[in-house]
Amino acid sequence: MAKKVLIVEDDKFLRELISQKLLKEGYDIAETVDGEKGLETVKKEKPDLVLLDLILPGINGFDVLTKIKEDPSLAQIPVIILSNLGQKDDIERGLKLGAVDYLIKAHFTPGEIIAKVKSVIG
């Protein structure tokens, strides 16, 4: 059975680009464009991994991550943050809240993002 990745990203171009690459690699994909829908989808679909933007409409990615990690039925789901926020404080906060990795969008190609996903969930 294919592993499912949830992409929570409001940038349509980036979301679709990553989705297409993950689909080509054999992953199932779910997509949402805001924090609330992202959290609902995590609860409903229990994906194998979440790619999470931080600056989102509605509740931000830090809050989504906190809620995922506080819920015992979701806490084991790995979350990779994918954000333009590159300040040391933001990175440390994301990792401290439980993200398995923090990728700054400008520093990673879509191919490298897919490689990170593979390294976490195979």
Model-inferred region functions:
Residues 16-24:
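Charged docking surfaces used in two-component/phosphorelay signaling
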Residues 34-37, 60-66:
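Acidic catalytic/metal-coordinating carboxylates
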Residues 53, 83:
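Active-site residues of response regulator receiver
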Residues 26-33, 41:
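Short hydrophobic/Thr-rich beta-strand motif most characteristic of the beta2 strand and flanking loop
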Residues 9:
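Conserved acidic carboxylate
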Residues 15, 57, 66, 75, ...:
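The feature encodes the CheY-like receiver
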